[in-house]
């Protein structure tokens, strides 16, 4: 009985150790701010990455809907090249299953910075397409915050997920008017 209890505790500890995710934080001191992973300074050597074979585009490629064999072959080819280039972080977009973020990290040591467009290209609220996102609209705010909460919940504790990025140059394409923008200094 004593051995069974010890074995069970050892099993829980082992499973817990493998389920641990890296501790990511920002430190601030007199020298400035630094990203830290597991207490060590971390310099991002990163790039955007998406698997888009010749003859396809970001919409038609549907890479994550392929069979596991196709996905592994694509990842193994691409990630080994990135690793050889000393890339340590790739920027991917929502839609990548968490298990592939973990696969990339566990096999190649590459972290993922996961990007949610955060309304950059428009969004659908209550079944209505809104081409230009109005971030001051309470319904838009509620919708976007709900999407981010779901994103965080879905990817919580995913090994290899370094951080989230909300938006992609969301200031481009906006129509600004009003005292604040009209009084913006010309030299800035």
Where are these regions (language model features)?
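Sec-dependent N-terminal signal peptides
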Residues: 4-15
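Active-site-proximal flexible loops/turns
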Residues: 9, 53, 122, 172-176
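Boundary at the C-terminal end of the N-terminal hydrophobic targeting segment
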Residues: 17-19
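Active-site-adjacent substrate/metal-binding segments within catalytic domains
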Residues: 22-156, 160
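Polysaccharide-binding and catalytic clefts of secreted carbohydrate-active enzymes
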Residues: 161, 165-188
């Amino acid at each position: 009985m004593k051995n069974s209890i010890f074995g069970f505790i050892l099993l829980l500890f082992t499973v817990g150790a493998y389920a641990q995710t890296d501790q990511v934080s920002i430190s601030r001191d007199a020298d400035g701010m630094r990203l830290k992973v597991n207490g060590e300074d971390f310099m991002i050597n990163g790039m955007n990455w998406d698997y888009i074979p010749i003859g396809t585009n970001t919409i038609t490629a549907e890479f994550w809907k392929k069979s596991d064999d196709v996905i592994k072959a694509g990842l193994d080819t691409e990630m080994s090249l990135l690793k050889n280039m000393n890339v340590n972080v790739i920027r991917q977009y929502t839609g990548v299953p968490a298990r592939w973020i973990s696969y990339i990290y566990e096999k190649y040591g590459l972290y993922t910075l996961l990007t949610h467009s955060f309304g950059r290209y428009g969004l659908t609220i209550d079944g209505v397409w809104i081409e230009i996102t109005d971030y001051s609209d309470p319904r838009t705010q509620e919708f976007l915050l709900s999407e981010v909460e779901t994103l965080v919940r879905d990817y919580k504790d995913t090994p290899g997920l370094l951080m989230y990025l909300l938006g992609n140059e969301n200031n481009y394409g906006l129509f600004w008017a009003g005292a604040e923008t009209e009084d913006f200094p010309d030299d800035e």
